[in-house]
């Protein structure tokens, strides 16, 4: 079982390494205990898929930081406080909160939001 940065190293700037190390180690230890008790453990489903979903979500945000997407969102003319809260929640490590649309739809949500901001700001300039 790989845990922490061995699972996936994303970026040296963000603090995701500590969060992923903690969550992956905690989950792995629970699954090892189950396995030692001869209980069934599906490592792909119970561990890999769960951790992978969190890593994929956070990777979207690391990429968005470096390509300017997050800057465009945070410094738009009329930032929506609720959207900023939802995005900051992801950056704080809540990458498994499926109630948050910026987790659930992370692969497309940020790009849609930037397009909406661009259109809104173009229309407001008329």
Predicted feature residues:
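A general structural signal for well-ordered alpha-helical packing
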Residues: 3-6, 22, 29, 44, ...
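A conserved FAD-binding loop/helix module that cradles the flavin
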Residues: 10-29
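Short FAD-binding loop at a beta-strand-to-alpha-helix junction that anchors the flavin cofactor
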Residues: 1-13
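C-terminal helical "tail/cap" subdomain of flavin- and related membrane-associated enzymes
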Residues: 30-126
